Amino acid sequence: TEAMCMPCFTTDHNMAKKCRDCCGGNGKCFGYQCLCNRG
């Protein structure tokens, strides 16, 4: 399963970066979830 970080908020313009950082550089927002891609 994919690890999940904090929820992604569309009002936060830095959210994509926060999600990537939380996932160790490989993650993206999908809806309101931050999904980590295990690479």
Curated annotation (Swiss-Prot):
GO terms for cellular component: extracellular region. Residues 1-3 form the signal peptide. Expressed by the venom gland. GO terms for molecular function: potassium channel regulator activity; toxin activity. Disulfide bonds join C5-C22, C8-C29, C19-C34, C23-C36. It is found in: Secreted. Its main location: secreted. The keyword Signal applies. It holds the Pfam family Toxin_5. InterPro entries: Scorpion_toxin-like_sf, Scorpion_toxinS_Cl_inh. Keywords: Amidation, Disulfide bond, Ion channel impairing toxin, Knottin, Potassium channel impairing toxin, Secreted, Signal, Toxin, Voltage-gated potassium channel impairing toxin. Inhibits Kv1.2/KCNA2 potassium channels. On glioma cells, may interact with chloride channels (probably Clc-3/CLCN3) and MMP2 at the surface of glioma cells. This complex may be then internalized via caveolae, thus inhibiting the chloride channels necessary for cell shrinkage and tumor propagation. The presence of a 'disulfide through disulfide knot' structurally defines this protein as a knottin. This is Chlorotoxin-like peptide MeuClTx. The lineage of its organism: Eukaryota, Metazoa, Ecdysozoa, Arthropoda, Chelicerata.
